Amino acid sequence: MTVYHFVGIKGTGMSALAQVLHDMNYTVQGSDVEKRFFTQKALEERGIPILPFNKENIKPGYTVIAGNAFPETHEEIQAAHELGVPVIRYHRFLGEFLQKFTSIAVTGSHGKTSTTGLLAHVMQGVHPTSYLIGDGTGKGIEGSKYFVFEACEYRRHFLSYFPDYAIMTNIDFDHPDYFANIDDVFSAFQEMALQVKKGIIACGDDEYLQKIQAKVPVLFYGFGDDNDFQARNVVKTTEGTAFDVFVRNTFFASFEIPHFGDHNVLNALAVIALCHYEEMDVRIIQERLKTFQGVKRRFSEKVLGNQILIDDYAHHPREIIATIDAARQKYPGREIVAIFQPHTYTRTQTFLREFAESLQQADQVYLCDIFGSAREHHGKLSIHDLQAQIPNSRLIQEDNTSILKQHENAVLIFMGAGDIQKFQEAYERTVHS
């Protein structure tokens, strides 16, 4: 049997896929940069070897799974070609692998990871379910009927997938380094919809998803009256959220989730709709929804003295608003402090005004330098351009996080898709020192 070698194994999708294959008794190893990433822990716990990049890592008989960030000129990929070792890109491999299961893709501009995690958690209460989540978490169960996975629209990678079902959470303009505009994003989702084989669960409150055409049934969920699955009588507390679900205007059941904000109600509705479609027991759905702990880097909380620290992946204006809203629901009356690290120059440039507006939902804003992606290390603008748009905002460096101590009893939200965790870790050290 072949050895699967992952080039860039610390990537979130790559790490999760490596875990899935390992759990299903395939032989797995991988290589990456030396820098430590939060995705490593699960790999290390499974004993999956993580090697430094070196062309000597590639041996005859291997199969190379290559991360999308690595060009054909990468030394390991070149070595594979020279040895006649097959090289398969991550999304292509996953697309072929899915065919062994009843597959459920979770896609959308926002909410993919949380919804994938929630769906996997609920379905595991009913059926053996393998899953791949974009927070670097994966689990493979031999003999599982279902495979739940996160499908990313970036560079249209999700067009490698032909799933049985798809959940579509929303369509929004993001990834401006690739997509030209919202119509370009919509066209990608429309193409994806035509590849789904059994059914689509889509948010009917989203104006773009309402226009989706498909060859299979489309069930809509949301708060609006026109949806097939509608949330009504929403009750928000500091413990979570409760709501009733009506299916085509007929009461179905009541549900509780230990999460906050309208976006989490919508995520739960999507899961309820899919499980209902697959005729799963409503009592199990209710119980599983109550016990979901969330996914990595999505409203991850920690108590530090009198302060609450929240780590969140929010890197788009709409996500920032959702995260701040959730914090206000759980911690009413507390000062909300946003510490934000913009992710990529192109996104910051494109949404400069929207970032300023969304961040001003917080009581105080601190800004970190822009985090450039692997594909872009500098841009025409700097963090000062965003600061100029936000009255009373301040810049923060990794070595001066102690200024956050002045916000006693506050909720500090560290947001971003780069390495914003470094700032939280630095702050925790100043408090403990």
UniProtKB/Swiss-Prot annotation:
GO terms for biological process: cell division; cell wall organization; peptidoglycan biosynthetic process; regulation of cell shape. It is found in: Cytoplasm. Keywords: ATP-binding, Cell cycle, Cell division, Cell shape, Cell wall biogenesis/degradation, Cytoplasm, Ligase, Nucleotide-binding, Peptidoglycan synthesis. GO terms for molecular function: ATP binding; UDP-N-acetylmuramate-L-alanine ligase activity. One of its GO terms (cellular component) is cytoplasm. The keyword Metal-binding does not apply. It is an enzyme of class 6 (ligase). InterPro entries: Mur-like_cat_sf, Mur_ligase_C, Mur_ligase_C_dom_sf, Mur_ligase_cen, Mur_ligase_N, MurCDEF_pg_biosynth, UDP-N-AcMur_Ala_ligase_MurC. Its EC number is 6.3.2.8. Coiled coil: none annotated. ATP binds at G108, S109, H110, G111, K112, T113, S114. Pathway: Cell wall biogenesis; peptidoglycan biosynthesis. Pfam families: Mur_ligase, Mur_ligase_C, Mur_ligase_M. Belongs to the MurCDEF family. This is UDP-N-acetylmuramate--L-alanine ligase. It comes from Geobacillus sp. (strain WCH70). The gene is murC.
